[in-house]
Amino acid sequence: GPSGFLGMR
């Protein structure tokens, strides 16, 4: 996903 929340995955 985007580097906002699920971006860490």
Curated annotation (Swiss-Prot):
Disulfide bonds: none annotated. The modification Arginine amide is found at residue 9. Expressed in the antennal lobe (at protein level). This is Tachykinin-related peptide 1. It is found in: Secreted. Keywords: Amidation, Neuropeptide, Secreted. GO terms for cellular component: extracellular region. Transmembrane segments: none annotated. GO terms for biological process: neuropeptide signaling pathway.
